């Protein structure tokens, strides 16, 4: 498989009519014009903004599309459902293909019944919730109360979930049972000429332990102190266990039965993440999502690290984030290792950003990425970030126009 991709890239093979349609997807960022807590904000206006710059043409093999992240534990279920329906209706009204991203890992503010184990004065309090969050050692006595996230700026967030907790995983599956049928029903009712509007459903969101929700030594004591005094330490990509912060993952590793003493090793964290994603994908598949429309979102930071394996499972197509190697995916050894072993019909660059505002750099990067016909879509994170770099839109247009 890898050899086929590499030869196709070098030779610039064009399959023309035999090649599948591919997509450049623009992710509309939560909190920047769209927010599921305000369902009406996911309506036609945000689609029209994209279409004004990138109108689709039926004769183009590369089409543009829109995506949004629905964080299922961030808002009450009825609000999330309404937001999803508004989003899907707008996609149909504007004939815009979409990727529905369902996030079960981040922003679980609306489910204190899962994470609040320490504050009896607040909703959801239950000491047993220690089992649903991560620990800094092998005992639930070392459960964490706080975590930090840095997606451009460090902020305080709720604890990293225990990805192996039966109660937490069941809550994730319950939300899939709530949302996935809505997407499938919508797709089923589309006329034949609009069936292509559902590119796919993506599960997971850079699934990892300690990557997007990390903890500092003595972090629980910081909860009662001003955030301005919080430590800020650089992300250490080479440290595949703790990323240079406090080691967590003990809860998930112990709950999953991998080990309950000694030191955590790299395969432990990989196996937990892979099993978690496979569980979610199996649930979605059982609900009726075909493999070619189901994507699992993995990530890796150190070249070739085992975490890249996490999104590969029998139920979905693997997908990864690309920042460091966005200019040339052939250099991403972790992704290439998994493309060579995956039997999935497709894969995706489901979170993508090239750190350049140069039009030709973007054109060339997209050409390299989509030279593999198995790459279903590239999702640019985010649409809102493009405004500061006019060359990005120019590069995308140039690439699309160059395709037959």
Positions of predicted regions on the chain:
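Polysaccharide-binding and catalytic clefts of secreted carbohydrate-active enzymes
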Residues: 129-308
């Amino acid at each position: 498989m890898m050899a086929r991709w590499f030869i196709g890239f070098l030779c610039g093979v064009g399959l023309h009519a035999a090649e599948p349609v591919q997509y450049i997807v623009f992710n509309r960022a939560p909190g920047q014009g769209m927010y599921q807590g305000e369902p009406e904000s996911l309506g036609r206006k945000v689609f029209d903004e994209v279409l004004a710059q990138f109108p689709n043409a039926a004769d183009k093999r590369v089409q543009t599309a829109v995506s949004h992240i629905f964080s299922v534990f961030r808002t009450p279920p009825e609000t999330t459902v309404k937001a999803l329906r508004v989003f899907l209706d707008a996609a149909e009204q504007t004939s815009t293909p979409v990727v529905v991203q369902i996030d079960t890992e981040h922003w679980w503010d609306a489910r204190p019944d899962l994470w609040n184990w320490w504050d009896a004065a607040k909703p959801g309090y239950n000491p047993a919730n220690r089992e649903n969050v991560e620990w800094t050692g092998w005992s639930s006595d070392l459960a964490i109360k706080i975590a930090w996230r840095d997606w451009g700026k460090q902020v305080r967030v709720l604890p990293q979930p225990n990805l192996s907790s039966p109660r937490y995983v069941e809550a994730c599956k319950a939300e899939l049972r709530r949302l996935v049928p809505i997407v499938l029903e919508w797709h089923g009712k589309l006329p034949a000429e609009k069936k292509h509007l559902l590119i796919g459903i993506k599960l997971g969101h850079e699934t990892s332990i300690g990557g997007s929700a990390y903890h500092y030594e003595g972090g629980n004591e910081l909860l009662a102190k001003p955030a301005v005094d919080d430590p800020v330490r650089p992300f250490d990509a080479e440290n595949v266990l703790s990323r240079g912060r406090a080691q967590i993952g003990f809860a998930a590793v112990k709950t999953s039965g991998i080990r309950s003493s000694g030191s955590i090793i790299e395969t432990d964290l990989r196996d937990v993440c892979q099993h978690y994603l496979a569980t979610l994908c199996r649930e979605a598949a059982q609900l009726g999502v075909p493999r070619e429309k189901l994507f699992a979102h993995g990530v890796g930071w150190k070249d070739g690290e085992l975490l890249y394996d996490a999104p590969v499972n029998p139920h979905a197509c693997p997908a990864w984030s690309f920042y460091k190697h966005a200019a040339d995916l052939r250099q991403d050894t972790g992704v290439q290792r998994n493309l060579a072993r995956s039997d999935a019909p497709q894969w995706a660059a489901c979170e993508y950003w090239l750190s350049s505002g140069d039009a030709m750099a973007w054109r060339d990067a997209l050409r390299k990425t989509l030279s593999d016909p198995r790459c279903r879509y590239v999702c640019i994170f985010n649409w809102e970030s493009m405004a500061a770099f006019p060359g990005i839109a120019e590069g995308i247009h140039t690439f699309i126009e160059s395709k037959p």
